[in-house]
From Swiss-Prot:
Superkingdom of the organism of origin: Bacteria
Name of the protein: Regulator of ribonuclease activity A
Compartment list: Cytoplasm
Chain ranges passing through the membrane: none
Pfam family, one: RraA-like
GO molecular function: endoribonuclease inhibitor activity; enzyme binding
Quaternary structure and interacting proteins, as annotated: Homotrimer. Binds to both RNA-binding sites in the C-terminal region of Rne and to RhlB.
Family annotation (Gene3D superfamilies): Ribonuclease E inhibitor RraA/RraA-like
Keywords assigned by UniProt, alphabetized: Cytoplasm
Any one of the GO BP annotations: negative regulation of RNA catabolic process
Protein's job: Globally modulates RNA abundance by binding to RNase E (Rne) and regulating its endonucleolytic activity. Can modulate Rne action in a substrate-dependent manner by altering the composition of the degradosome. Modulates RNA-binding and helicase activities of the degradosome.
Organism expressing this protein natively: Yersinia enterocolitica serotype O:8 / biotype 1B (strain NCTC 13174 / 8081)
Amino acid sequence: MKYDTSDLCDIYHEEVNVVEPLFSNFGGRTSFGGKITTVKCFEDNGLLFDLLEENGLGRVLVVDGGGSVRRALINAELADLALKNEWEGIVVYGAVRQVDELAELDIGIQAMAAIPVGAADEGIGESDIRVNFGGVTFFSGDHLYADNTGIILSEEPLDIE
């Protein structure tokens, strides 16, 4: 489904929170949305492999990487895993790498920046916890909608159709 965050903000301005404009699109799908699962991990993407192995139909992974752009939390291998398990998208408060490959995958990926240095894979981090970045607090179970204009968050799914 295609989302227009500008229209959604006009219609649901009382029900949505708007994430500060810190992010750019890196995936092949420029519009995505779904129920979020949160994870907090700093320069370590080992936990992301476990989470993206799960069925992601209708889900978006929100990764609080502490805003670090020194190491990429998402690479082509993780993005491909997410695509195979039907995740709608990934939002990374941090960096990605292998951007040419990411752009060819039919999955939404938004992040702050790209860097060629990969993350550690020790599995250090926490999932399904409250995370805060971009002026918004994210809880697993909230609903996120993203496009080239921005990212918005709602506690309940928006009636889009």
